[in-house]
Regions:
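P-loop NTPase motor core
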Residues: 2-66
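Catalytic cores of large soluble enzymes that bind and process phosphate-bearing ligands
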Residues: 42, 95, 249
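Hydrophobic/aromatic-lined pockets within catalytic cores
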Residues: 55, 108-111, 209, 213
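Short, flexible loop segments at the rims of nucleotide/cofactor-binding pockets, characterized by
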Residues: 36-39, 166-168, 190-194
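Conserved helicase NTPase catalytic core signature
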Residues: 62-188, 198-202
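Conserved helicase motor core of SF1/SF2 NTP-dependent helicases
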Residues: 3-14, 19-22, 154-155, 175-188, ...
Length: 280
């Protein structure tokens, strides 16, 4: 499975559809200004801005208040303590559910009985209402606006279409705010065409798959016109204990084709296999 397909599947609860990367590339050919916006949204600076936004949400997203059910009451101050102390390590939009489970256990212990399905739903709705919103699409749109970018179209779920430039930032926001499925059972991930992966994609790969990860690529074959030096920033994400193997001997083409291609790409350190053909 490609990383794009994985991302689209993980975002199904946020948007019903996402733009394909090749559609974005075609769009950028006729709208060159769009290309710069794509790289801006994949950058470390953009990610740092999002981290600042996540910290702001810890307070701005919450409306914590007293909870009462029949003769049972838990004060807002107690809920605040649970939310910001006991369960602080849980991502923000999953944290109140942990508080709810704690309160349900407390109530059932005091009442000497289990809550029925209808009561469980009531507890859930009341505690989820302490969030101003849990909609990742809305939260990301607000973030874009806060950093001076155009917000996403304000439409119902069924009409949402996420541009490719926003796919991985939205996925990062979701994984930062929700307790998502871990992938610790996966022991090996192979990344092909490594030259086409952005900073934020590598950050997500590192976060999702803490396993061995061979990265394969060809710096002379990027999808995008703007090239990035992946090897320069990878140690900042994966640490300096990485091993680089450069294979610069070409077996696929005749010397005439390879020399012509190297002139176009500016590659000078390629070792050519001595096999001749027609002049180019």
């Amino acid at each position: 499975m490609s990383f794009d397909l994985f991302a689209y599947r993980e975002l199904k609860d946020v948007v019903p559809d996402c733009e394909d990367r090749y559609d974005m590339i075609e769009r950028n050919l006729v709208q060159p200004k769009e290309r710069g916006r794509y790289w801006e949204k994949q950058s470390p600076d953009f990610l740092n801005q999002m981290e600042g936004y996540l910290m702001e949400l810890e307070d701005s997203l919450m409306d914590i208040r007293d909870f009462t059910y029949r003769n049972y009451e838990i004060k807002a101050s107690r809920i605040l303590l649970l939310f910001y102390t006991r369960f602080l390590e849980i991502p923000l939009l999953s944290r109140m559910d942990a508080v709810r489970e704690y309160v349900v256990d407390d109530y059932e212990t005091l009442a000497g009985r289990d809550l029925n399905e209808e009561e469980q739903q009531y507890f859930y709705e009341q505690f989820m209402a302490m969030y101003e919103t849990r909609d990742i699409y809305v939260l990301y749109s607000r973030f874009l606006e806060s950093v001076g970018m155009c917000p996403l179209p304000s439409v119902w779920y069924e009409k949402r279409l996420l541009r490719y430039e926003d796919v991985y930032p939205v996925l990062y926001l979701k994984y930062s705010l929700f307790r998502c499925k871990n992938h610790h059972g996966i022991k090996h991930v192979v990344v092909d065409e490594m030259q086409d992966y952005s900073w934020i994609q590598y950050v997500l790969l590192r976060k999702l798959f803490p396993c061995r990860m061979p990265l394969l690529g060809d710096m002379a074959q990027p999808l995008e016109e703007q090239q990035q030096d992946v090897l320069k920033f990878l140690p900042k994400i994966f640490g300096r204990d990485i091993r680089k193997i450069v294979m610069n001997r070409s077996y696929r083409n005749t010397m005439e084709i390879a020399e012509y291609a190297n002139k176009l790409t500016g590659i000078q350190d390629m070792e050519l296999f001595e096999r001749h053909g027609e002049p180019v």
